[in-house]
């Protein structure tokens, strides 16, 4: 879940492997456990759980797997508590990086995060050092063609999204429509669009960069791609957000 929508080329390709799918399921399983601990196992009475379930469905996790994970999380020993932390820092050439973690061992995770920054030409910063470069908002992505290859009508979708409470409707990407919401409104907008028959490929809270930085030299491209890969391979890391403009240029280098 690195970067932001159209800048996530590397991640999207990596997630097609079975190993990456297993990683995604492990990470979402932790989010389910936290949501259930905080609000119980009924999604109708637990908006956070409902959001995580929607995220799991968008990641193509089968309903049976989601239900089993919920039952497992509801019956788990509550002594195993996951702690949410957000780390901020810089990648090569000043790329802004935000790392969201969910861990049962804060010291282990902090050490890993610092190591990845240091190893690949970046540095871990103080809280707030880069977050001002991002807007935290709800993001819903809907494919321009549905599962039956029918073209989704732009005007109809835009009207439905704005009526549901969306703040912005973006059409720059050739493959998806991007709908942005205020953080508290994500669930309501998503549910309204789902009720209208739309299927989404992403529906989550994201850090959206206000500006992007382009890398040009091969070493920086390699280091930035490898840094993101290491973060995403760590089970404690839930999301990595950055303002790297051209991750696709590193595809053939790693």
Each PLM stretch: what is its role?
Residues 1-143, 185, 242:
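N-terminal cationic and glycine-rich segments that engage phosphates or anionic surfaces
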Residues 143-254:
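Positively charged, low-complexity, intrinsically disordered RNA-binding extensions
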């Amino acid at each position: 879940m690195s970067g932001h929508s159209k800048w996530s080329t590397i991640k999207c390709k990596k997630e097609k492997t079975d190993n990456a799918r297993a990683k995604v399921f492990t990470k979402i399983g932790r989010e389910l456990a936290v949501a259930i601990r905080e609000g119980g196992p009924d999604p109708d009475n637990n908006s956070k759980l409902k959001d995580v379930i929607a995220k799991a469905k968008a990641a193509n996790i089968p309903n049976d797997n989601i239900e089993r994970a919920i039952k497992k999380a509801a019956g788990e020993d509550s002594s195993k508590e996951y702690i949410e932390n957000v780390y901020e820092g810089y990648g090569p050439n000043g790329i802004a990086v935000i790392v969201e973690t969910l861990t049962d061992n804060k010291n282990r995770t902090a050490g890993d995060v610092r190591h990845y920054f240091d190893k690949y030409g970046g540095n871990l910063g103080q809280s707030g050092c880069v977050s001002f470069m991002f807007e935290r908002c709800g993001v819903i992505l809907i494919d321009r063609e549905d599962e039956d290859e029918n073209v989704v009508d732009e005007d109809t979708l835009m009207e439905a999204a704005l009526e549901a409470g969306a703040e912005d409707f973006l059409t720059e990407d050739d493959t998806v429509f991007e709908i942005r919401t205020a953080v508290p409104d994500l669930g309501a907008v998503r549910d309204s669009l789902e009720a209208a028959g739309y299927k989404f490929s992403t529906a989550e809270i994201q850090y959206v960069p206000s500006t992007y930085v382009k890398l040009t030299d091969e070493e920086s491209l390699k280091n930035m791609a490898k840094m993101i890969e290491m973060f995403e391979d760590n089970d404690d890391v839930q999301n990595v957000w950055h303002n790297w403009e051209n991750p696709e240029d590193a595809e053939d280098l790693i």
